[in-house]
Amino acid sequence: MKTFVAKPAAVKRDWYVVDAEGKTLGRIATEIASRLRGKHKAEYTPHVDTGDYIIVINAEKVRVTGKKASDKIYYRHSEFPGGLKSISFEKLIDRKPEMVIELAVKGMLPRGPLGRAMYRKLKVYAGAEHNHTAQQPQVLDI
């Protein structure tokens, strides 16, 4: 019996919409990352992008447990000397609520060209509206 290997052209990708309102950040991010990789499908192949498209709405209403809202710090560096910037979860959720979910999911995807292709299938919106109704996304309960 031969091992099944999915062909990139033969992969069927569905569109799903996830409501992040009241959900815990890490728990929703792990399920989204798994769906983006395609691990929920029988034809999952590690070196082929078999995942689905995921639309996340209400990103501004995602929650974290404990004191992480004030204690969780996001760092970035400008590559110049002294260019280390930091921002707390509270401030980031006020300024760019989409970025909180994007960073959490991106950290759970593989590094490299395949991981970047998976990440491009993630669409995050701060409010309840999204502009992907033409794709007829199915509601995904997480």
Curated annotation (Swiss-Prot):
<dbReference type="GO" id="GO:0022625">
    <property type="term" value="C:cytosolic large ribosomal subunit"/>
</dbReference>
<dbReference type="InterPro" id="IPR023563">
    <property type="entry name" value="Ribosomal_uL13_CS"/>
</dbReference>
<dbReference type="GO" id="GO:0017148">
    <property type="term" value="P:negative regulation of translation"/>
</dbReference>
<dbReference type="GO" id="GO:0006412">
    <property type="term" value="P:translation"/>
</dbReference>
<dbReference type="InterPro" id="IPR005823">
    <property type="entry name" value="Ribosomal_uL13_bac-type"/>
</dbReference>
<protein>
    <recommendedName>
        <fullName>Large ribosomal subunit protein uL13</fullName>
    </recommendedName>
</protein>
<dbReference type="InterPro" id="IPR005822">
    <property type="entry name" value="Ribosomal_uL13"/>
</dbReference>
<dbReference type="Pfam" id="PF00572">
    <property type="entry name" value="Ribosomal_L13"/>
</dbReference>
<dbReference type="GO" id="GO:0003735">
    <property type="term" value="F:structural constituent of ribosome"/>
</dbReference>
<comment type="function">
    <text>This protein is one of the early assembly proteins of the 50S ribosomal subunit, although it is not seen to bind rRNA by itself. It is important during the early stages of 50S assembly.</text>
</comment>
<dbReference type="GO" id="GO:0003729">
    <property type="term" value="F:mRNA binding"/>
</dbReference>
<keyword id="KW-0687">Ribonucleoprotein</keyword>
<keyword id="KW-0689">Ribosomal protein</keyword>
<dbReference type="InterPro" id="IPR036899">
    <property type="entry name" value="Ribosomal_uL13_sf"/>
</dbReference>
<comment type="subunit">
    <text>Part of the 50S ribosomal subunit.</text>
</comment>
<comment type="similarity">
    <text>Belongs to the universal ribosomal protein uL13 family.</text>
</comment>
